[in-house]
From Swiss-Prot:
<dbReference type="Pfam" id="PF00012">
    <property type="entry name" value="HSP70"/>
</dbReference>
<keyword id="KW-0597">Phosphoprotein</keyword>
<feature type="modified residue" description="Phosphothreonine; by autocatalysis">
    <location>
        <position position="174"/>
    </location>
</feature>
<feature type="compositionally biased region" description="Polar residues">
    <location>
        <begin position="579"/>
        <end position="593"/>
    </location>
</feature>
<dbReference type="InterPro" id="IPR012725">
    <property type="entry name" value="Chaperone_DnaK"/>
</dbReference>
<dbReference type="GO" id="GO:0051082">
    <property type="term" value="F:unfolded protein binding"/>
</dbReference>
<dbReference type="InterPro" id="IPR029048">
    <property type="entry name" value="HSP70_C_sf"/>
</dbReference>
<comment type="function">
    <text>Acts as a chaperone.</text>
</comment>
<keyword id="KW-0067">ATP-binding</keyword>
<dbReference type="GO" id="GO:0140662">
    <property type="term" value="F:ATP-dependent protein folding chaperone"/>
</dbReference>
<protein>
    <recommendedName>
        <fullName>Chaperone protein DnaK</fullName>
    </recommendedName>
</protein>
<dbReference type="InterPro" id="IPR029047">
    <property type="entry name" value="HSP70_peptide-bd_sf"/>
</dbReference>
<keyword id="KW-0547">Nucleotide-binding</keyword>
<keyword id="KW-0143">Chaperone</keyword>
<keyword id="KW-0346">Stress response</keyword>
<dbReference type="GO" id="GO:0005524">
    <property type="term" value="F:ATP binding"/>
</dbReference>
<dbReference type="InterPro" id="IPR013126">
    <property type="entry name" value="Hsp_70_fam"/>
</dbReference>
Length: 606
Protein backbone atom coordinates (compact mmCIF):
# COMPACT_ATOMS: atom_id res chain seq x y z
CA UNK A 1 0.00 0.00 0.00
CA UNK A 2 1.34 3.42 -0.98
CA UNK A 3 2.28 5.72 1.88
CA UNK A 4 -0.13 8.39 3.07
CA UNK A 5 1.83 11.47 4.09
CA UNK A 6 0.98 14.24 6.53
CA UNK A 7 1.29 17.84 5.35
CA UNK A 8 1.32 21.08 7.32
CA UNK A 9 0.41 23.68 4.69
CA UNK A 10 1.48 26.76 6.62
CA UNK A 11 1.29 30.50 6.08
CA UNK A 12 5.05 31.02 6.46
CA UNK A 13 6.48 27.51 6.13
CA UNK A 14 5.18 24.11 5.05
CA UNK A 15 6.33 20.62 6.05
CA UNK A 16 5.70 17.04 4.98
CA UNK A 17 6.07 13.95 7.17
CA UNK A 18 5.57 10.19 7.03
CA UNK A 19 5.63 7.20 9.36
CA UNK A 20 8.86 5.25 9.62
CA UNK A 21 8.73 2.25 11.90
CA UNK A 22 5.61 3.60 13.55
CA UNK A 23 7.22 6.97 14.32
CA UNK A 24 6.41 10.23 12.50
CA UNK A 25 9.39 11.67 10.62
CA UNK A 26 9.84 14.98 8.79
CA UNK A 27 10.98 14.62 5.17
CA UNK A 28 13.68 17.13 4.16
CA UNK A 29 13.19 19.07 0.94
CA UNK A 30 15.49 19.12 -2.10
CA UNK A 31 17.52 21.93 -0.48
CA UNK A 32 18.12 19.77 2.61
CA UNK A 33 15.87 21.74 4.97
CA UNK A 34 12.96 20.40 7.02
CA UNK A 35 11.02 23.65 6.53
CA UNK A 36 9.90 24.76 3.07
CA UNK A 37 9.02 28.48 2.88
CA UNK A 38 5.44 28.93 1.62
CA UNK A 39 6.68 31.28 -1.10
CA UNK A 40 6.06 31.09 -4.85
CA UNK A 41 7.75 33.23 -7.51
CA UNK A 42 7.56 33.64 -11.26
CA UNK A 43 10.80 34.81 -12.83
CA UNK A 44 10.72 37.22 -15.75
CA UNK A 45 11.80 34.43 -18.12
CA UNK A 46 8.79 32.33 -17.07
CA UNK A 47 10.44 30.00 -14.57
CA UNK A 48 8.44 28.89 -11.52
CA UNK A 49 10.27 28.92 -8.18
CA UNK A 50 8.88 27.46 -4.96
CA UNK A 51 10.25 27.45 -1.42
CA UNK A 52 13.73 28.67 -0.53
CA UNK A 53 14.72 29.54 -4.14
CA UNK A 54 11.62 31.77 -4.36
CA UNK A 55 12.30 33.40 -0.99
CA UNK A 56 15.95 34.13 -1.86
CA UNK A 57 15.06 36.19 -4.92
CA UNK A 58 12.09 38.03 -3.39
CA UNK A 59 13.93 41.34 -2.94
CA UNK A 60 14.89 41.63 -6.62
CA UNK A 61 11.56 40.24 -7.86
CA UNK A 62 9.08 41.54 -5.28
CA UNK A 63 6.17 42.10 -7.68
CA UNK A 64 6.28 38.51 -8.96
CA UNK A 65 6.77 36.82 -5.58
CA UNK A 66 3.79 35.55 -3.55
CA UNK A 67 3.87 34.73 0.15
CA UNK A 68 1.28 34.13 2.91
CA UNK A 69 -1.28 32.96 0.33
CA UNK A 70 -2.95 30.88 3.05
CA UNK A 71 -4.52 34.07 4.41
CA UNK A 72 -6.58 34.29 1.20
CA UNK A 73 -7.82 30.70 1.05
CA UNK A 74 -11.58 30.47 0.65
CA UNK A 75 -11.86 33.96 -0.87
CA UNK A 76 -12.15 35.25 -4.43
CA UNK A 77 -8.69 36.84 -4.18
CA UNK A 78 -6.56 36.51 -7.33
CA UNK A 79 -2.84 36.90 -8.00
CA UNK A 80 -2.12 38.48 -11.39
CA UNK A 81 1.19 37.67 -13.06
CA UNK A 82 1.55 39.09 -16.57
CA UNK A 83 -1.77 38.33 -18.28
CA UNK A 84 -2.76 35.35 -16.11
CA UNK A 85 -4.66 35.25 -12.84
CA UNK A 86 -4.03 32.59 -10.20
CA UNK A 87 -6.38 31.58 -7.37
CA UNK A 88 -5.09 30.91 -3.83
CA UNK A 89 -5.80 27.22 -4.50
CA UNK A 90 -3.44 27.22 -7.50
CA UNK A 91 -0.63 28.98 -5.62
CA UNK A 92 -1.07 26.61 -2.65
CA UNK A 93 -1.03 23.67 -5.08
CA UNK A 94 2.40 24.80 -6.29
CA UNK A 95 3.68 24.56 -2.72
CA UNK A 96 2.04 21.15 -2.26
CA UNK A 97 3.48 19.89 -5.54
CA UNK A 98 6.97 20.92 -4.39
CA UNK A 99 6.50 19.02 -1.11
CA UNK A 100 5.12 16.00 -2.99
CA UNK A 101 7.93 15.93 -5.54
CA UNK A 102 10.71 16.30 -2.94
CA UNK A 103 9.14 13.59 -0.76
CA UNK A 104 8.87 11.22 -3.74
CA UNK A 105 12.56 11.75 -4.49
CA UNK A 106 13.44 11.14 -0.83
CA UNK A 107 11.28 8.03 -0.38
CA UNK A 108 11.81 6.64 -3.87
CA UNK A 109 8.12 5.96 -4.44
CA UNK A 110 5.09 7.88 -5.74
CA UNK A 111 2.88 9.77 -3.28
CA UNK A 112 -0.81 10.00 -4.11
CA UNK A 113 -2.61 10.46 -0.77
CA UNK A 114 -2.22 12.96 2.05
CA UNK A 115 -3.66 14.25 5.29
CA UNK A 116 -3.49 18.06 5.20
CA UNK A 117 -3.86 20.30 8.24
CA UNK A 118 -5.83 23.53 8.49
CA UNK A 119 -6.39 26.05 11.29
CA UNK A 120 -9.17 24.86 13.60
CA UNK A 121 -11.07 28.07 12.91
CA UNK A 122 -11.04 27.64 9.12
CA UNK A 123 -14.49 28.00 7.57
CA UNK A 124 -16.11 25.51 5.21
CA UNK A 125 -14.97 27.52 2.18
CA UNK A 126 -11.38 27.58 3.44
CA UNK A 127 -11.40 23.82 4.08
CA UNK A 128 -12.85 23.11 0.65
CA UNK A 129 -10.22 25.39 -0.93
CA UNK A 130 -7.51 23.35 0.81
CA UNK A 131 -8.93 20.11 -0.59
CA UNK A 132 -9.06 21.70 -4.04
CA UNK A 133 -5.40 22.74 -3.75
CA UNK A 134 -4.50 19.15 -2.95
CA UNK A 135 -6.42 17.89 -5.99
CA UNK A 136 -4.68 20.41 -8.28
CA UNK A 137 -1.33 19.20 -6.92
CA UNK A 138 -2.22 15.61 -7.80
CA UNK A 139 -3.01 14.51 -4.25
CA UNK A 140 -6.06 12.72 -2.92
CA UNK A 141 -6.75 14.49 0.36
CA UNK A 142 -7.99 11.61 2.50
CA UNK A 143 -8.52 13.81 5.55
CA UNK A 144 -8.50 17.45 6.60
CA UNK A 145 -7.38 17.70 10.23
CA UNK A 146 -7.24 20.73 12.51
CA UNK A 147 -3.73 21.95 13.31
CA UNK A 148 -4.08 22.03 17.12
CA UNK A 149 -5.53 18.51 17.04
CA UNK A 150 -2.58 17.31 14.96
CA UNK A 151 -0.16 18.89 17.43
CA UNK A 152 -1.96 17.12 20.29
CA UNK A 153 -1.51 13.79 18.47
CA UNK A 154 2.22 14.47 18.17
CA UNK A 155 2.43 15.33 21.88
CA UNK A 156 0.26 12.52 23.21
CA UNK A 157 1.31 9.55 21.05
CA UNK A 158 3.20 7.81 23.89
CA UNK A 159 1.61 9.52 26.89
CA UNK A 160 -0.12 7.44 29.54
CA UNK A 161 -2.94 8.44 31.86
CA UNK A 162 -5.66 11.02 31.32
CA UNK A 163 -4.80 14.67 30.71
CA UNK A 164 -6.57 17.86 29.77
CA UNK A 165 -4.30 19.76 27.40
CA UNK A 166 -4.56 23.18 25.79
CA UNK A 167 -2.93 23.71 22.41
CA UNK A 168 -1.97 27.35 21.80
CA UNK A 169 -1.27 27.66 18.06
CA UNK A 170 0.03 31.02 16.82
CA UNK A 171 1.31 30.57 13.29
CA UNK A 172 2.32 32.97 10.56
CA UNK A 173 -1.21 34.02 9.67
CA UNK A 174 -3.72 32.35 11.99
CA UNK A 175 -4.35 31.76 15.68
CA UNK A 176 -6.14 28.77 17.22
CA UNK A 177 -6.60 27.48 20.72
CA UNK A 178 -8.03 24.01 21.33
CA UNK A 179 -8.70 22.07 24.51
CA UNK A 180 -8.53 18.28 24.41
CA UNK A 181 -8.94 15.35 26.75
CA UNK A 182 -6.47 12.59 25.98
CA UNK A 183 -6.09 9.16 27.50
CA UNK A 184 -5.87 5.49 26.52
CA UNK A 185 -5.49 6.35 22.85
CA UNK A 186 -8.54 8.64 22.71
CA UNK A 187 -7.97 12.25 21.65
CA UNK A 188 -11.20 14.18 22.16
CA UNK A 189 -11.46 17.87 21.33
CA UNK A 190 -13.89 19.50 23.75
CA UNK A 191 -13.58 23.15 22.66
CA UNK A 192 -11.84 25.29 20.08
CA UNK A 193 -11.66 29.00 19.28
CA UNK A 194 -9.46 31.26 17.22
CA UNK A 195 -8.81 34.18 14.90
CA UNK A 196 -8.01 33.61 11.23
CA UNK A 197 -6.62 37.14 10.91
CA UNK A 198 -3.93 37.02 13.58
CA UNK A 199 -0.43 35.62 13.23
CA UNK A 200 3.30 36.24 13.14
CA UNK A 201 2.94 38.27 9.95
CA UNK A 202 1.04 40.90 11.95
CA UNK A 203 3.92 41.22 14.41
CA UNK A 204 6.32 41.70 11.49
CA UNK A 205 4.06 44.38 10.06
CA UNK A 206 4.19 46.40 13.29
CA UNK A 207 7.99 46.59 12.99
CA UNK A 208 7.67 47.55 9.33
CA UNK A 209 5.18 50.32 10.14
CA UNK A 210 7.49 51.64 12.87
CA UNK A 211 10.42 51.78 10.43
CA UNK A 212 8.31 53.38 7.69
CA UNK A 213 7.00 56.08 10.03
CA UNK A 214 10.50 56.94 11.31
CA UNK A 215 11.88 57.10 7.78
CA UNK A 216 8.96 59.27 6.66
CA UNK A 217 9.51 61.71 9.51
CA UNK A 218 13.24 61.97 8.83
CA UNK A 219 13.31 61.97 5.02
CA UNK A 220 9.74 62.59 3.81
CA UNK A 221 9.76 59.37 1.74
CA UNK A 222 7.07 56.67 2.06
CA UNK A 223 8.90 53.34 1.70
CA UNK A 224 5.59 51.47 1.29
CA UNK A 225 5.34 52.87 -2.22
CA UNK A 226 8.48 50.97 -3.25
CA UNK A 227 7.81 47.21 -3.53
CA UNK A 228 11.48 46.28 -3.39
CA UNK A 229 12.12 48.45 -0.32
CA UNK A 230 9.00 47.06 1.35
CA UNK A 231 10.17 43.49 0.74
CA UNK A 232 13.52 44.33 2.36
CA UNK A 233 11.70 45.87 5.33
CA UNK A 234 9.57 42.75 5.88
CA UNK A 235 12.59 40.45 5.69
CA UNK A 236 14.46 42.65 8.20
CA UNK A 237 11.39 42.79 10.46
CA UNK A 238 11.01 39.01 10.51
CA UNK A 239 14.70 38.59 11.31
CA UNK A 240 14.47 41.18 14.12
CA UNK A 241 11.40 39.49 15.61
CA UNK A 242 13.20 36.14 15.67
CA UNK A 243 16.35 37.61 17.24
CA UNK A 244 14.35 39.36 19.95
CA UNK A 245 13.10 35.97 21.17
CA UNK A 246 16.61 35.32 22.50
CA UNK A 247 18.11 38.83 22.74
CA UNK A 248 17.10 42.02 24.53
CA UNK A 249 17.86 44.15 21.49
CA UNK A 250 18.76 43.82 17.82
CA UNK A 251 20.22 46.00 15.08
CA UNK A 252 18.30 46.69 11.86
CA UNK A 253 20.62 47.82 9.09
CA UNK A 254 19.30 48.44 5.58
CA UNK A 255 21.82 50.34 3.44
CA UNK A 256 20.68 52.08 0.25
CA UNK A 257 17.00 51.62 1.09
CA UNK A 258 16.07 54.73 -0.95
CA UNK A 259 17.46 57.72 -2.86
CA UNK A 260 16.82 61.42 -2.28
CA UNK A 261 18.06 63.22 -5.32
CA UNK A 262 21.50 61.74 -5.85
CA UNK A 263 21.98 60.91 -2.18
CA UNK A 264 21.56 57.29 -1.00
CA UNK A 265 19.59 56.85 2.23
CA UNK A 266 20.03 54.11 4.80
CA UNK A 267 18.25 52.66 7.83
CA UNK A 268 20.33 51.84 10.90
CA UNK A 269 18.35 51.53 14.14
CA UNK A 270 18.29 49.52 17.35
CA UNK A 271 15.05 47.77 18.28
CA UNK A 272 14.76 46.65 21.89
CA UNK A 273 12.53 43.85 23.09
CA UNK A 274 10.67 46.35 25.27
CA UNK A 275 9.90 48.56 22.25
CA UNK A 276 8.82 45.55 20.19
CA UNK A 277 6.44 44.46 22.95
CA UNK A 278 5.07 48.00 23.13
CA UNK A 279 4.42 47.96 19.36
CA UNK A 280 2.65 44.60 19.51
CA UNK A 281 0.88 44.78 22.88
CA UNK A 282 -2.62 44.79 21.38
CA UNK A 283 -1.80 41.75 19.21
CA UNK A 284 -0.91 39.74 22.30
CA UNK A 285 -4.16 40.94 23.88
CA UNK A 286 -6.08 39.54 20.88
CA UNK A 287 -5.00 36.01 21.83
CA UNK A 288 -6.68 36.29 25.22
CA UNK A 289 -10.36 36.43 24.20
CA UNK A 290 -10.31 33.19 22.14
CA UNK A 291 -8.39 31.46 24.94
CA UNK A 292 -10.98 32.51 27.51
CA UNK A 293 -13.83 31.50 25.16
CA UNK A 294 -12.37 28.02 24.68
CA UNK A 295 -12.02 27.58 28.45
CA UNK A 296 -15.59 28.73 28.99
CA UNK A 297 -16.97 26.41 26.28
CA UNK A 298 -15.03 23.52 27.83
CA UNK A 299 -16.32 24.39 31.30
CA UNK A 300 -12.80 24.56 32.68
CA UNK A 301 -10.73 27.04 34.66
CA UNK A 302 -7.06 27.73 33.79
CA UNK A 303 -5.93 25.68 36.80
CA UNK A 304 -7.72 22.59 35.46
CA UNK A 305 -5.49 22.47 32.37
CA UNK A 306 -2.77 19.86 32.92
CA UNK A 307 -0.44 20.69 30.02
CA UNK A 308 -0.01 23.56 27.56
CA UNK A 309 1.40 22.83 24.11
CA UNK A 310 2.83 25.69 22.06
CA UNK A 311 2.56 25.42 18.27
CA UNK A 312 3.77 27.81 15.57
CA UNK A 313 7.00 29.77 15.37
CA UNK A 314 5.38 32.92 16.80
CA UNK A 315 4.91 31.20 20.18
CA UNK A 316 8.67 31.54 20.71
CA UNK A 317 8.14 35.24 21.47
CA UNK A 318 8.75 35.85 25.21
CA UNK A 319 5.67 38.11 25.47
CA UNK A 320 3.44 35.17 24.43
CA UNK A 321 5.13 32.71 26.76
CA UNK A 322 5.01 35.13 29.69
CA UNK A 323 1.27 35.73 29.24
CA UNK A 324 0.55 32.00 29.11
CA UNK A 325 2.68 31.34 32.19
CA UNK A 326 0.97 34.15 34.11
CA UNK A 327 -2.57 33.16 33.08
CA UNK A 328 -2.29 29.41 33.63
CA UNK A 329 0.22 29.41 36.47
CA UNK A 330 2.44 26.87 34.77
CA UNK A 331 5.20 26.63 32.19
CA UNK A 332 4.24 25.44 28.71
CA UNK A 333 5.73 22.15 27.49
CA UNK A 334 9.20 22.44 25.96
CA UNK A 335 9.41 18.92 24.50
CA UNK A 336 7.36 19.70 21.39
CA UNK A 337 8.95 21.44 18.40
CA UNK A 338 6.48 24.26 17.59
CA UNK A 339 7.46 24.23 13.91
CA UNK A 340 7.15 20.48 13.37
CA UNK A 341 4.40 19.25 15.73
CA UNK A 342 1.54 19.81 13.28
CA UNK A 343 3.16 17.91 10.40
CA UNK A 344 4.15 15.07 12.74
CA UNK A 345 0.57 14.84 14.01
CA UNK A 346 -0.74 14.79 10.44
CA UNK A 347 1.59 11.85 9.72
CA UNK A 348 0.20 10.03 12.77
CA UNK A 349 -3.36 10.56 11.51
CA UNK A 350 -2.22 9.32 8.09
CA UNK A 351 -0.89 6.22 9.85
CA UNK A 352 -4.24 5.68 11.58
CA UNK A 353 -6.10 5.94 8.26
CA UNK A 354 -3.56 3.69 6.53
CA UNK A 355 -3.72 1.05 9.27
CA UNK A 356 -0.11 1.49 10.40
CA UNK A 357 -1.16 2.83 13.82
CA UNK A 358 -3.93 1.24 15.82
CA UNK A 359 -5.68 2.03 19.11
CA UNK A 360 -5.92 5.77 18.45
CA UNK A 361 -9.33 7.40 18.26
CA UNK A 362 -9.64 11.06 17.28
CA UNK A 363 -12.81 13.01 18.03
CA UNK A 364 -12.76 16.55 16.64
CA UNK A 365 -15.36 19.32 16.73
CA UNK A 366 -16.80 21.92 14.40
CA UNK A 367 -15.27 25.31 15.28
CA UNK A 368 -18.21 27.45 14.15
CA UNK A 369 -21.99 27.18 14.44
CA UNK A 370 -24.03 26.38 11.33
CA UNK A 371 -27.47 27.66 10.50
CA UNK A 372 -29.65 29.65 8.14
CA UNK A 373 -31.02 33.15 7.74
CA UNK A 374 -34.61 33.47 8.94
CA UNK A 375 -37.20 36.24 8.83
CA UNK A 376 -35.77 39.64 9.75
CA UNK A 377 -32.19 38.72 8.87
CA UNK A 378 -31.72 36.64 12.02
CA UNK A 379 -29.13 33.83 12.12
CA UNK A 380 -30.81 30.66 13.38
CA UNK A 381 -28.30 28.03 14.52
CA UNK A 382 -28.85 24.36 13.71
CA UNK A 383 -25.46 22.90 14.68
CA UNK A 384 -23.74 24.63 17.59
CA UNK A 385 -20.00 25.22 17.66
CA UNK A 386 -17.83 22.58 19.37
CA UNK A 387 -20.25 19.82 18.33
CA UNK A 388 -18.29 16.57 17.79
CA UNK A 389 -17.93 15.59 14.12
CA UNK A 390 -19.02 13.87 11.96
CA UNK A 391 -22.55 15.04 12.73
CA UNK A 392 -25.93 15.33 11.03
CA UNK A 393 -28.82 17.49 12.25
CA UNK A 394 -32.15 18.45 10.72
CA UNK A 395 -34.71 21.16 11.35
CA UNK A 396 -38.11 21.95 9.88
CA UNK A 397 -38.71 25.31 8.19
CA UNK A 398 -41.73 26.78 6.44
CA UNK A 399 -42.75 29.55 4.05
CA UNK A 400 -43.03 33.24 4.95
CA UNK A 401 -45.68 34.18 2.35
CA UNK A 402 -48.92 32.65 1.05
CA UNK A 403 -48.73 30.20 -1.85
CA UNK A 404 -44.98 30.23 -2.18
CA UNK A 405 -43.77 27.54 -4.58
CA UNK A 406 -40.09 28.10 -3.88
CA UNK A 407 -37.91 29.35 -1.06
CA UNK A 408 -34.35 30.61 -0.86
CA UNK A 409 -32.39 29.21 2.05
CA UNK A 410 -29.27 31.16 2.99
CA UNK A 411 -26.78 28.90 4.79
CA UNK A 412 -24.26 30.55 7.12
CA UNK A 413 -21.44 29.74 9.51
CA UNK A 414 -20.53 31.84 12.53
CA UNK A 415 -21.55 33.05 15.97
CA UNK A 416 -23.14 36.48 15.40
CA UNK A 417 -26.86 37.11 15.96
CA UNK A 418 -27.49 38.68 12.55
CA UNK A 419 -27.02 36.78 9.30
CA UNK A 420 -25.10 39.63 7.65
CA UNK A 421 -22.34 39.38 10.27
CA UNK A 422 -21.59 35.69 9.61
CA UNK A 423 -19.85 33.73 6.84
CA UNK A 424 -22.08 32.92 3.89
CA UNK A 425 -21.68 29.34 2.62
CA UNK A 426 -24.22 29.67 -0.15
CA UNK A 427 -27.86 30.11 -1.09
CA UNK A 428 -30.10 27.13 -1.78
CA UNK A 429 -33.13 27.34 -4.03
CA UNK A 430 -35.84 24.81 -3.22
CA UNK A 431 -38.68 24.83 -5.71
CA UNK A 432 -41.63 22.61 -6.58
CA UNK A 433 -43.38 23.29 -3.27
CA UNK A 434 -47.20 22.81 -3.57
CA UNK A 435 -48.98 26.20 -3.17
CA UNK A 436 -50.31 26.64 0.38
CA UNK A 437 -50.89 29.36 2.97
CA UNK A 438 -47.75 30.54 4.71
CA UNK A 439 -46.67 28.39 7.62
CA UNK A 440 -48.24 25.23 6.18
CA UNK A 441 -45.42 23.72 4.03
CA UNK A 442 -42.86 21.72 5.98
CA UNK A 443 -39.35 21.83 4.58
CA UNK A 444 -36.78 19.63 6.30
CA UNK A 445 -33.25 20.97 5.91
CA UNK A 446 -30.44 18.61 6.90
CA UNK A 447 -26.91 19.71 7.68
CA UNK A 448 -24.07 17.17 7.57
CA UNK A 449 -20.50 17.86 8.62
CA UNK A 450 -18.06 15.14 7.57
CA UNK A 451 -14.79 14.12 9.24
CA UNK A 452 -12.98 16.83 7.28
CA UNK A 453 -15.23 19.52 8.76
CA UNK A 454 -16.79 20.15 5.33
CA UNK A 455 -20.50 20.92 5.19
CA UNK A 456 -23.08 19.12 3.05
CA UNK A 457 -26.72 20.26 2.88
CA UNK A 458 -29.90 18.64 1.59
CA UNK A 459 -33.59 19.59 1.68
CA UNK A 460 -36.85 17.64 1.50
CA UNK A 461 -40.44 18.74 1.10
CA UNK A 462 -42.26 16.66 3.73
CA UNK A 463 -45.67 17.15 2.12
CA UNK A 464 -44.73 15.38 -1.10
CA UNK A 465 -41.84 13.33 0.26
CA UNK A 466 -39.84 14.51 -2.69
CA UNK A 467 -36.22 15.32 -1.97
CA UNK A 468 -34.92 18.33 -3.80
CA UNK A 469 -31.43 18.56 -5.17
CA UNK A 470 -29.72 21.67 -3.90
CA UNK A 471 -26.64 23.24 -5.40
CA UNK A 472 -24.49 25.73 -3.54
CA UNK A 473 -24.09 28.85 -5.66
CA UNK A 474 -20.80 29.74 -3.98
CA UNK A 475 -18.48 31.36 -6.52
CA UNK A 476 -15.46 30.77 -4.31
CA UNK A 477 -15.64 27.00 -4.68
CA UNK A 478 -14.00 25.47 -7.70
CA UNK A 479 -15.96 23.24 -10.03
CA UNK A 480 -14.65 19.83 -11.09
CA UNK A 481 -13.86 21.33 -14.50
CA UNK A 482 -11.87 24.17 -12.93
CA UNK A 483 -9.91 21.76 -10.73
CA UNK A 484 -9.18 19.59 -13.77
CA UNK A 485 -8.03 22.62 -15.78
CA UNK A 486 -5.81 23.86 -12.96
CA UNK A 487 -4.37 20.35 -12.48
CA UNK A 488 -3.42 20.25 -16.15
CA UNK A 489 -1.84 23.71 -15.88
CA UNK A 490 0.13 22.57 -12.82
CA UNK A 491 1.37 19.57 -14.81
CA UNK A 492 2.44 21.92 -17.59
CA UNK A 493 4.47 23.88 -15.04
CA UNK A 494 6.05 20.60 -13.97
CA UNK A 495 6.85 19.77 -17.60
CA UNK A 496 8.27 23.27 -18.08
CA UNK A 497 10.43 22.79 -14.97
CA UNK A 498 11.68 19.47 -16.37
CA UNK A 499 12.56 21.14 -19.68
CA UNK A 500 14.25 24.00 -17.86
CA UNK A 501 16.38 21.59 -15.81
CA UNK A 502 17.30 19.68 -18.98
CA UNK A 503 18.34 22.95 -20.66
CA UNK A 504 20.52 23.94 -17.70
CA UNK A 505 22.13 20.50 -17.44
CA UNK A 506 22.78 20.39 -21.20
CA UNK A 507 24.24 23.90 -21.14
CA UNK A 508 26.53 22.94 -18.25
CA UNK A 509 27.69 19.84 -20.15
CA UNK A 510 28.33 21.95 -23.25
CA UNK A 511 30.37 24.51 -21.29
CA UNK A 512 32.44 21.71 -19.74
CA UNK A 513 33.03 20.19 -23.19
CA UNK A 514 34.12 23.58 -24.57
CA UNK A 515 36.57 23.96 -21.67
CA UNK A 516 37.94 20.46 -22.34
CA UNK A 517 38.26 21.17 -26.07
CA UNK A 518 40.17 24.43 -25.51
CA UNK A 519 42.52 22.70 -23.06
CA UNK A 520 43.08 19.90 -25.57
CA UNK A 521 43.97 22.42 -28.30
CA UNK A 522 46.32 24.22 -25.93
CA UNK A 523 48.09 20.98 -25.01
CA UNK A 524 48.16 19.24 -28.38
CA UNK A 525 47.29 21.83 -31.04
CA UNK A 526 50.85 22.06 -32.29
CA UNK A 527 51.05 18.29 -32.75
CA UNK A 528 48.11 17.83 -35.15
CA UNK A 529 47.21 19.19 -38.55
CA UNK A 530 46.11 22.82 -38.92
CA UNK A 531 43.02 21.56 -40.72
CA UNK A 532 41.99 19.49 -37.68
CA UNK A 533 42.71 22.37 -35.29
CA UNK A 534 40.53 24.67 -37.42
CA UNK A 535 37.69 22.15 -37.50
CA UNK A 536 37.77 21.80 -33.71
CA UNK A 537 37.79 25.60 -33.28
CA UNK A 538 34.83 25.88 -35.67
CA UNK A 539 32.90 23.29 -33.65
CA UNK A 540 33.72 25.17 -30.43
CA UNK A 541 32.46 28.48 -31.88
CA UNK A 542 29.31 26.78 -33.19
CA UNK A 543 28.58 25.29 -29.76
CA UNK A 544 29.25 28.63 -28.03
CA UNK A 545 26.70 30.29 -30.30
CA UNK A 546 24.14 27.56 -29.58
CA UNK A 547 24.35 28.07 -25.79
CA UNK A 548 24.25 31.89 -25.88
CA UNK A 549 20.43 32.28 -25.67
CA UNK A 550 18.69 32.26 -22.26
CA UNK A 551 16.54 29.36 -23.47
CA UNK A 552 18.57 26.93 -25.56
CA UNK A 553 17.45 24.34 -28.10
CA UNK A 554 18.49 21.13 -26.34
CA UNK A 555 18.52 18.99 -29.48
CA UNK A 556 20.67 21.46 -31.42
CA UNK A 557 23.11 21.81 -28.51
CA UNK A 558 23.36 18.03 -28.14
CA UNK A 559 24.08 17.74 -31.87
CA UNK A 560 26.76 20.46 -31.55
CA UNK A 561 28.29 18.60 -28.60
CA UNK A 562 28.29 15.38 -30.59
CA UNK A 563 30.12 17.06 -33.49
CA UNK A 564 32.70 18.62 -31.17
CA UNK A 565 33.19 15.31 -29.34
CA UNK A 566 33.76 13.58 -32.66
CA UNK A 567 36.38 16.17 -33.68
CA UNK A 568 38.12 15.82 -30.31
CA UNK A 569 38.08 12.07 -30.83
CA UNK A 570 40.12 12.55 -34.00
CA UNK A 571 42.77 14.41 -31.99
CA UNK A 572 42.79 11.59 -29.46
CA UNK A 573 43.08 9.00 -32.21
CA UNK A 574 45.93 10.90 -33.83
CA UNK A 575 47.83 11.25 -30.56
CA UNK A 576 47.34 7.57 -29.77
CA UNK A 577 48.65 6.53 -33.19
CA UNK A 578 51.59 8.92 -32.82
CA UNK A 579 52.46 7.46 -29.44
CA UNK A 580 52.25 3.92 -30.83
CA UNK A 581 54.50 4.79 -33.77
CA UNK A 582 57.02 6.48 -31.46
CA UNK A 583 57.21 3.36 -29.34
CA UNK A 584 57.84 1.04 -32.38
CA UNK A 585 60.79 2.23 -34.55
CA UNK A 586 60.08 -0.48 -37.11
CA UNK A 587 56.93 1.34 -38.15
CA UNK A 588 57.73 4.70 -39.68
CA UNK A 589 60.48 5.90 -37.29
CA UNK A 590 64.31 5.60 -37.26
CA UNK A 591 66.59 5.41 -34.26
CA UNK A 592 68.27 8.60 -35.44
CA UNK A 593 65.22 10.61 -34.49
CA UNK A 594 63.76 8.97 -31.39
CA UNK A 595 60.18 10.04 -30.78
CA UNK A 596 60.27 11.74 -34.22
CA UNK A 597 58.85 15.24 -34.41
CA UNK A 598 55.45 15.18 -36.08
CA UNK A 599 55.33 17.24 -39.26
CA UNK A 600 52.03 18.63 -40.58
CA UNK A 601 50.78 16.53 -43.46
CA UNK A 602 52.56 13.29 -42.49
CA UNK A 603 49.22 11.84 -41.34
CA UNK A 604 45.89 12.12 -42.97
CA UNK A 605 43.09 11.42 -40.50
CA UNK A 606 39.99 9.91 -42.10
Amino acid sequence: MAKIVGIDLGTTNSLIAYLEGGRPTIIPNAEGSRLTPSVVAFTKDGQLLVGEPAKRQAIVNAERTIKSIKRHMGTNYKVKIDDKEYTPQEISAMILRKLKKDAEAYLGEPIEKAVITVPAYFSDAQRQATKDAGAIAGLEVVRIINEPTAAALAYGLDKEGHQKILVFDLGGGTFDVSILEIGEGVFEVIATAGNNRLGGDDFDERIVNWLVEMFMEEHGINLKEDRTALQRLFEAAEKAKIELSSKLQTEINLPFIAMKGNTPLHISVTLTRAKFEELTYDLVEKTKEPTERALKDAGLSPSQIDKIILVGGATRMPCIQEWIKKHFGKEPQRNVNPDEAVALGAAIQAGVIGGEIRDIVLVDVTPLSLGIETLGGVFTKIIERNTPIPVSKSQIFTTAADYQTSVEIHVLQGERALAKDNISLGRFILDGIPPAPRGVPQIEVTFDIDVNGIVHVSARDKATGREQRITISNAIRLSEEEIKRMTEEAKRFEEEDRKRREEIETKNQAEHLIYTARKTLKDYGDKVSKDLVQRVEDKIKNLEELIKPERINVEQVKKGMEELTQALGEIGQFMYQSASAAGNPGQGQTNENPGGKTIDGDYKVN
